[in-house]
Structure formats: structure tokens, C-alpha cells
Amino acid sequence: MDKTTQVNQKTGLLSQPKAVWAVAFACVISFMGIGLVDPILPAIAAQLHASPSEVSLLFTSYLLVTGFMMFFSGAISSRIGAKWTLILGLIFIIVFAGLGGSSSSIAQLVGYRGGWGLGNALFISTALAVIVGVSVGGSAQAIILYEAALGLGISVGPLAGGELGSISWRAPFFGVSVLMFIALIAISFMLPKLPKPAKRVGVFDAMKALKYKGLLTMAVSAFLYNFGFFILLAYSPFVLDLDEHGLGYVFFGWGLLLAITSVFTAPLVHKALGTVRSLVVLFIAFAAILVIMGIWTDHQTLIITCIVVAGAVLGMVNTIMTTAVMGSAPVERSIASSAYSSVRFIGGALAPWIAGMLSEHFTASTPYTVGGIVVFVGMLVLLMGRKHLAGIKAGH
């Protein structure tokens, strides 16, 4: 490694073009949408006369549409260009977040969240490729920046949701719509027009990429991991028995640790243990946290502690998995990312609804226990497919 490379690696993360920061800002707002509704779930359930499983569909519709559309986002981007794909995604989010705030029934709100998910799919998958493409310091630096935006968005989302939700459950939806409009203006002016790829991405290229065992192993394990992730995120507000402010602060702490470990701790752990060993250890830790939450569900302080501590684990998992996926198959990074993200989000889509049904038909602790078991199975998938991941280098 020459001195120039060393300097770029040291300064690249923060010394980025304005276009990168514009996209990163929009990423923060976009990821706010994941945790934004967390503190207002009980309020929505009460005011729209919905059960926990019905309210959980706000996550399910959002994530299901996001996951499904991510299979095709690369094909869309290669035809209309990355910048216009970002802009189109932002417009969808602005419109459907605003419509969500004006909903009069849970069915309407669930439908509008699905439309929000469509915009999210177009934006998120393209944003990662754009940040990697226009940033300085290499792909590993860009991925860390992207995961930091993810963590910051997820942490600020509940805080904003709690503060605005104390005014009305509708306020967070209108708030995101306004912030995304600001992001739209920033990207329109700061992001230069990016050249379209020489070769168009096929409509089904992302699906076809899953034939590679390394990528398939990562995708399936992420599907199972994200099931546990969204059990924690979407179900916990109903267990904690806190108001909007309290829920906002708890999940702000969770997201803050997630953001910190995704940027600072994950690269160190990845380098020290390698891809498979680091993920196996972290999956076991997350599964154990969920099982503990299942055993002592009635202990509010313990549940809060487990949620916040889990953020540290999840931040490392997110960065290590996203980095590893880029080298898990002999396809373009954008295609690998789309395939992986699609399967990952679909796993997350199932968890909230299943958690609600389990709690209604069994006990309040059942969703956590089931989530822990599913994450443990995800760890077994990694172990069984480890030979297909042997070529992935830390910090790829």
C-alpha cells in the first residue's frame, strides 16, 4: 500500500464531495422512515381502533414492497439513470408520507406505507451505488458512510417520531414529507448527472444473482437475521408500556449505539475475526438477547437495557454483512446489493405481523423467543455456507 492510498483511507470518510453528503442526508431521512412509527404505534392502535397485529402491518406493507421492488430497482436505474431514480424515489416518499398523515383508517395508512416503501426501494438501493460511485476513499469507506447514515436515520427516526407524535400521530408523517422535499432539492442541485451504465441491467438480473451460493448464503442469513431485527423494533413498543416520548428516547439510544458500532467497531471486529466468525459470534449474541427478553418480558428496565445493547450488536452485523455481500458473487455490486437487500427486507416484512399474531394467540414473550430461535437458525445457515464465503476479505 502506497502513501497516497493510506492518506485517502484516513481522510476519505469525511472528505467527501457535496454530492455524497446530499445523498447521505437523504439516506438519513429515508431510514428515519423505518423507526419513525415506532413510538406512535400504540397511539395509532388506540386512535384508529386497530389491534397490534393490524398496526404491525405498517411495517409489513412498507418492507414487503421495499423488498420486492429492490429486485427491479437496478434495472430501472440503468434505464433512467441513477440521479433520476433517486429523484423518483424521493417523490414517491414525499407523496405517500404526506398521504399517510392524512389517513382516516388503518387500511388507508397501511396502503400508503406500501407506496412509501416503493419510493424507499428506488432510493435506498440506488443511493448505496451512488455513494460508492462518487465518494473518495474506496468502497469500504463508502459502505461505512452509508451504514452510518442508516444508523443515524434509524436512531433519529424514533426520537423525531416521539417528539412529533406527542403532538399528533400524524405529525411524523408530515415531517418526513417536508424533510424529503428538502433532500429532493439538495440532490437535484448538488448531485451531477451520472452516466448510465454501458450495459443495461436485466429485469431479472438481481434474482438470477441468487444462484451464486455465496450471495444466497448471505441473503438467507440476512432474511432470518432481519426477522429478529424487526421483532425487536416493531413489537417492543407494545411491551414497554411507555408514552411517545419514552419510546422515542429508548429507540434513540438503540439507534445511536447502532450508528456508532457500524462506523467504528464493525471494521475492527471484521478485520480481527473475518466475515463468518464475526457474524457467527454476533448472531449468537443477538439471539441470546432476544431469548433473554423472552424470559423476562415483564421486567421493563431489563427490556430497555436489552434493546439498547442490541443496537451495538446490530450495527456491527449490518456493516459486516453489507461489506461482505459486495464480494460474495461475480456480479456488479449494485446487482448483488439489490438481490441481498430484497431478501433481507422481505424477512423484515414478515416479522412484525407474525409477532403481533404470536402475542395475541400465545403470550407476550413468545415473539422474542421465536425471534431468538430464527436468528440462531440464521447463524447455522452461515456456518453451513461458510465454504462459499471463504474468498470474502474483511473490508472488501
Swiss-Prot record:
Which Gene3D superfamilies does the record match to this protein?
MFS general substrate transporter like domains
Keywords attached to this Swiss-Prot or TrEMBL record, sorted alphabetically, are: Cell membrane, Copper, Copper transport, Ion transport, Membrane, Transmembrane, Transmembrane helix, Transport
From the Swiss-Prot or TrEMBL record, what is one GO molecular function term? transmembrane transporter activity
- A GO BP entry: copper ion transport
Question: Looking at the record's lineage, which domain of life comes first?
Answer: Bacteria
> PANTHER family given for it?
MULTIDRUG EFFLUX PROTEIN YFMO
Other known facts = Cotranscribed with yfmP.
Q: What does this protein do?
A: Acts to efflux copper or a copper complex. It is possible that YfmO could contribute to copper resistance.
* Protein name, per record: Multidrug efflux protein YfmO
Q: Name the species this protein comes from.
A: Bacillus subtilis (strain 168)
